A protein has these predicted regions:
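Glycine-rich phosphate-binding loops that contact phosphosugars or nucleotide phosphates
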Residues: 1-143, 176, 188-193
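A short, well-structured juxtamembrane/interface segment
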Residues: 151-167
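Acidic catalytic cores of enzymes that act on phosphate-bearing nucleotides/polynucleotides
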Residues: 166-187
Length: 195
């Protein structure tokens, strides 16, 4: 799993999921660093590249390196006509639409949803995730739109909390497990300049 910034954070979350739902060992890399490592490429591996725009230069360069080694590649992108998508053997589109602000919140959630479904399916197909648990986790996803609606009803409370955080002298983002990369992304959004 290879990406930069927000996309890399979604790679980190996906590592937790794939290792939970399968017996696979998963590696993640920041795209800019991937090219400078002494990589031991394995033709049996799938190299997944995550990029909101599909044009991230470091991610494209890492993909290009894998293509030169005749490795299997897949991309998770928002723009299906992008360079990264065209160069990949398969594409998992996130269909999040264009980002309006500096923070890539829609794309991050879209990447995570697609990669969660991907992780579940890989676990099910490999037989590492039993069918009963697979169906339950898929069923839980169907509740997501309702949970989002309920959360959005709390807009006034959320605005008060946001104001308190904004006026505070400092903040800490504390998480463990698969929530750790979410904290990294939260910190990234929190410290991003407003448009």
């Amino acid at each position: 799993l290879i990406g930069c910034g927000t996309a890399y954070h979604s790679c980190l979350v996906t590592k937790y999921w794939l290792e939970e739902f399968t017996n696979l060992v998963i590696e993640t890399d920041i795209a800019s660093e991937f090219r400078y490592r002494n990589n031991r490429f394995d033709k049996n591996n799938l190299y997944i590249f995550v990029s909101q725009s599909g044009e991230t230069a470091d991610t494209f360069a890492a993909l290009d390196l894998c293509k030169k080694e005749n490795l299997k590649t897949c991309s998770v992108v928002n723009v299906v006509e992008s360079s990264i998508a065209r160069q990949s053997d398969c594409v998992l589109p996130i269909h999040a639409g264009p980002e309006i602000g500096v923070a890539s919140t829609k794309a991050f959630l879209g990447q995570m949803l697609v990669l969660y479904l991907f992780s579940l399916k890989i676990g099910e197909v490999r037989g590492d995730l039993d069918n009963k648990k697979y169906k339950k986790l898929i069923s839980n996803l169907k509740n997501l739109p309702q949970l989002i609606k309920e959360t959005l009803k709390e807009e006034q409370k959320i605005q008060l909390i946001a104001k308190d955080i904004y006026n505070s002298k400092g903040s800490m983002f504390l998480c463990i497990g698969s929530s750790y990369p979410i904290a990294l992304e939260g910190w990234s959004v929190y410290t991003s300049p407003s448009p």
